[in-house]
Amino acid sequence: MPSGFNAKSFLKNVTSAPGVYRMYDKHQQVIYVGKAKDLKKRLSSYFRVNIANVKTQALVSHIDHIDVTVTHSETDALLLENDYIKQYMPKYNVLLRDDKSYPYILLSGHKHPRLAYHRGPKREKGHYFGPYPNGGAVRESLHLIQKLFPIRQCDDLYYKSRSRPCLQYQLDRCSAPCVGIVSDDEYSEQVKLAGLFLRGKDKQVISQLVAKMETAAIDMEYERAAQYRDQITALRRVAEQQEVSNHKGDMDVIGVDYASGIACFHLLFIRDGKIFGSRSYYPSVPAETEIEEVLSSFLGQFYLNADIQRTIPKEVILSHHFDGITELQASIEHALDKKFELKTQVRGDRANFLRLAMTNASNAVATKLSHKNTVEQRFQLLEEALELNEPIKRMECFDISHTMGESTVASCVVFNREGPHKADYRRYNITGITGGDDYAAMEQAISRRFDKIDNNGKVPDLVFIDGGIGQLRVAQTIVDEKCVNIDHPPLLICVTKGEGRKAGLETFTVGGSEQTFEVASDSPAFHLMLHIRDESHRFAITGHRNKRQKTRNTSTLESIAGVGPKRRKALLQHLGGIQEVKGASVAELTKVPGISLEMAQTIHDALRGG
């Protein structure tokens, strides 16, 4: 324990009321947040003579001072603890790292509602279906629904500017309410059916469609009856693919596996008896943390997340029991003001779902451990190859991508000892340089990256430059200038492609000394350096292609006199893209708001070379 902190004196003044405590280190950083029913009793436990837990020993050794906040109840303490953990992200707390809001499908409240991907606050009027486990699940569902129900998915501006059906109508994926091809009643009918389908009422949807098909057949509307028949067939095919149980309610099923410092919470979202989706969480767990704390911390943070409170089911099945589960359940139930039950002893369908969740969690941890061991070995061998005295915690790699100097983009990718850390990836749009000047592009990218760096920031141990010695020199000059007050400035290494740009013939040069070094091409250290180089190249070229395409979509129109930003936007949105604009007749161009006959002729001639 640091001599600057007097635990005995501190504990004399601590109350026995419920509350939250924040532990700070000498740098005034919050390193741990905890809650207690009895603050004095809980805080005293940290300063006993014999502390067996290694994590607690490490925590106590770094305490500089402790702040205490008294609350009215244990529930209030739980809520405040959750807020503080999200605010400070303390290093000794179990942290739910993926705290993004869940994605939903929005069925808007317009006269002709649209289906859309939604993430974030629910401000727009309409019905929200979800939550879905990830964005991919939403997009997959939207793609499926588009095949089953011809409801628009375009944005409102595009919808309002249409004068003719778009491609989605030709593909039978939209009934074109924008131009009145479908009646309001027919469109509303499909919207209601889509809503029922999204609520999991497949049988009800099919039943209604069967009735409509039979009515259409009786009325000798055979084409309409055939449309209903095809819709029913597609729906039945989808329904057969979904796993269904005899349990018809909503619940979350959580399988937990914890080994070698890696914890996985695999969640199955059961809605109306079906597996609606699944998602794995890997909370950041400090070394030597007990499983009870991992469970309690995760559940508290997860179910008190404001983004998902309104969609929490009443029943949550958990693979592990732990001390304090009853109190945690009561606190969450009180905080949410709704019935909430944590169960660990289940049978039948619930047990089957739980076994599935546990299997997925176990497999996920095994995969993570295997990957972690492989990455760790690569880092250790790279440290040996570079003869480093300190372990590598963070590596970055920069690359430049352009086409003949057009749409230049720089990338910065980040690796830590778990592999690629994509949350820290960055792209830089390079401006104000001569096209094709890779040195100036690298200078701008490195300058922007290191502009605000300090000892408390994310200082890389290694920086790789994908390029030649000239780019390395530019980067080294900038780093020397920007990192003058940094205790341990990064080591720069450039990766230069070999003869014929063949993989395995790369050369590596150290910044400053400009000495080259060799690593066997079959060495894991070599593979690690090429991995980060290739990832940087991939990230740069993807950004460059996106920027180039966006530029080319507008640059053709930019060259036409009289076509400013507003007219370009109107043309692209009204007609659906640059190719459609190029293929439009003069008459079609005049239907775009703001385009006169004379302007339409000018645009037509410019794009057709006439």
From Swiss-Prot:
It is found in: Cytoplasm. Signal peptide: none annotated. Its main location: cytoplasm. PROSITE patterns: GIY_YIG (PS50164), UVR (PS50151), UVRC (PS50165). Residues 203-238 form the UVR domain. Keywords: Cytoplasm, DNA damage, DNA excision, DNA repair, Excision nuclease, SOS response. One of its GO terms (biological process) is SOS response. Pfam families: GIY-YIG, HHH_5, UVR, UvrC_RNaseH, UvrC_RNaseH_dom. Residues 16-94 form the GIY-YIG domain. InterPro entries: GIY-YIG_endonuc (IPR000305), GIY-YIG_endonuc_sf (IPR035901), GIY-YIG_UvrC_Cho (IPR047296), Hlx-hairpin-Hlx_DNA-bd_motif (IPR003583), RuvA_2-like (IPR010994), UVR_dom (IPR001943), UVR_dom_sf (IPR036876), UvrABC_protein_C (IPR050066). One of its GO terms (molecular function) is excinuclease ABC activity. Transmembrane segments: none annotated. It comes from the Bacteria. GO terms for cellular component: cytoplasm; excinuclease repair complex. CDD domains: GIY-YIG_UvrC_Cho (cd10434). Belongs to the UvrC family. The UvrABC repair system catalyzes the recognition and processing of DNA lesions. UvrC both incises the 5' and 3' sides of the lesion. The N-terminal half is responsible for the 3' incision and the C-terminal half is responsible for the 5' incision. Interacts with UvrB in an incision complex. This is UvrABC system protein C.
